[in-house]
Amino acid sequence: MLDLKRIRTDFDVVAKKLATRGVDQETLTTLKELDIKRRELLIKAEEAKAQRNVASAAIAQAKRNKENADEQIAAMQTLSADIKAIDAELADVDANLQSMVTVLPNTPADDVPLGADEDENVEVRRWGTPREFDFETKAHWDLGESLGILDWERGAKVTGSRFLFYKGLGARLERAIYSFMLDEHAKEGYTEVIPPYMVNHDSMFGTGQYPKFKEDTFELADSPFVLIPTAEVPLTNYYRDEIIDGKELPIYFTAMSPSFRSEAGSAGRDTRGLIRLHQFHKVEMVKFAKPEESYQELEKMTANAENILQKLNLPYRVITLCTGDMGFSAAKTYDLEVWIPAQNTYREISSCSNTEDFQARRAQIRYRDEVDGKVRLLHTLNGSGLAVGRTVAAILENYQNEDGSVTIPEVLRPYMGNIDIIKPN
């Protein structure tokens, strides 16, 4: 959530930045007018309360002097009614301000490229060379079926579209991948966490999913709980409403969890395969850092995600998202896109973001500076390290052989009982 004080004192700069995120000028003007109205009401309330205090003192003095105080009593009653009306109006203004500010996206960092959509994202670097096949490649969903490791038909029967069963070596491959990822992140200083897979509405507000993106989630009927869309939500909210000792920062968390998404607005997109599901596993990285260190930590986090792809020997590229393509809470985001041969393109497999103090303000996550003792908002970062199902898809397609078998990447073999190949049934 943006700081109202910052909006007030630096309105033109904030308005210009938010315009690059698609926020219209009318919304910003209304916000400014509401804030001015709020300050005017606060002044009126203070003045009326001061006058009421004077009237109250005059009544007390009149009673001590055994004088008639009817005029002062009437004046105080009028002032009390005025104060009640001002307070009611102020409550309405505060509610309107709060509802507006909570749906405003974060402002982009100064070095984020300007752009309306994904077509204006900027490529930063590439790693690896896409393999040249001397046979016709298959898509991962066809490979999974022919290998007997992915069952889409029964997933649809048991639940519905965008669900599947992993079985046999498919299940082992999935487990091997996320175990490998967690072990790699542990080497980089991340503390592994098994979080709740359901959270409350306050947690969803804290990380920015609520109230704006409620339709993208699965809420449990007649319950205060929501199925997590990503482990970012419980991990970030771990310190909600807390003050952390500054000496402990930065703090690194990692977790593997299922993620549940309604994929509202995705009808017709990626209807086959592992790219877009209602339920999928993802290894998440979350960091809590001091403001002056957060962008250095973003580079490290992105490198941690890249490390996984490099050890799996999967070609990828890193792009900086433009202002119009960034997520709601992000101030800056790097996407990692892995090469998918059957689609002859790169597809997102990780997104690493610095939200600066945007989530910390919503969730009231603060730290006490060890030098001056002051309490300040910290910065939160989050990143996929990686999306497990998409990693399965990338491995199946990049490691496929002409006979329909799939070679297991060397780093995963110790996690699969040294199996080195998955062959068709």
UniProtKB/Swiss-Prot annotation:
Subcellular location as annotated: Cytoplasm
PROSITE patterns: AA_TRNA_LIGASE_II
Gene Ontology MF: a single term: ATP binding
Top-level taxon of the source organism: Bacteria
GO terms, biological process: selenocysteine biosynthetic process; seryl-tRNA aminoacylation
Gene Ontology terms: cellular component: cytoplasm
A UniProt-annotated Pfam family: Seryl_tRNA_N
Enzyme Commission numbers on file: 6.1.1.11
Binding-site residues for ATP, renumbered to this chain: 261-263, 348-351
Positions annotated to bind L-serine: 230-232, 284, 384
Pathway, per record: Aminoacyl-tRNA biosynthesis; selenocysteinyl-tRNA(Sec) biosynthesis; L-seryl-tRNA(Sec) from L-serine and tRNA(Sec): step 1/1
Alphabetical keyword list: Aminoacyl-tRNA synthetase, ATP-binding, Cytoplasm, Ligase, Nucleotide-binding, Protein biosynthesis
Swiss-Prot/TrEMBL catalytic activity: tRNA(Ser) + L-serine + ATP = L-seryl-tRNA(Ser) + AMP + diphosphate + H(+); tRNA(Sec) + L-serine + ATP = L-seryl-tRNA(Sec) + AMP + diphosphate + H(+)
Domain notes per entry: Consists of two distinct domains, a catalytic core and a N-terminal extension that is involved in tRNA binding.
Functional description taken from the UniProt entry: Catalyzes the attachment of serine to tRNA(Ser). Is also able to aminoacylate tRNA(Sec) with serine, to form the misacylated tRNA L-seryl-tRNA(Sec), which will be further converted into selenocysteinyl-tRNA(Sec).
Family indicated by similarity: Belongs to the class-II aminoacyl-tRNA synthetase family. Type-1 seryl-tRNA synthetase subfamily.
SUBUNIT field: Homodimer. The tRNA molecule binds across the dimer.
Protein name in UniProt: Serine--tRNA ligase
Species this protein is from: Streptococcus agalactiae serotype V (strain ATCC BAA-611 / 2603 V/R)
